[in-house]
């Protein structure tokens, strides 16, 4: 209906029942996203806009860098970064519906490219990107069936496409006790630092969180090839 919260960019999912957990599991399914983007093509952003991420991102991502945006959806993040001089951003999403829409929307912005692709098996060369950005992609995979296996596949691919000393930046609602298990696996060789950013006011962004009590989102910055000496 007209009054649904999506019109205001708010997708707040807080569930505590078996039924709610079942609904949350849809986030791991490509059919869910195809249907959703067809039904509701208005842009929305999970968790944060560029304004909330800029301070941390600009420490690690330079305008000259080749950047990969995982699970881009119809987020405005790449557009907002483009306006600030980031002109080499490859955006991928499993959903062909949203990729076609974004290709059309940004056809006049060279360097802002959109490709239909599965992050768990990317058709991209090794060591191709300086920075990989993930805003809720890992989180949505962790909602679905086979979450641990699929998360491992995604992160293995991220490690593959990153250049030496490249940086994977994951914006998440998941606390370090739940996320570092995945990110600090020795085979990735990542030095992981955790940052926090205050959650924006309701209505500005969307939440994918199962338990949204925290007042912050977490930004996990994973630097390839810089393993801590004591790890």
Say what each PLM segment does.
Residues 130-148:
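A short SAM/SAH-binding and catalytic strip from SAM-dependent methyltransferases
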Residues 45-65, 76, 80:
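Conserved alpha-helix/loop element of class I SAM-dependent methyltransferases that forms part
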Residues 148-164:
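A short glycine-rich, Lys/Arg-flanked "PGG" loop and its adjoining helix->strand segment in the class I
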Residues 177-231:
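Class I S-adenosyl-L-methionine
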Residues 120-132:
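A short acidic, Gly/Pro-enriched loop at the edge of an enzyme's catalytic core
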Residues 11-51:
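N-terminal, positively charged/glycine-rich alpha-helical extensions of SAM-dependent methyltransferases
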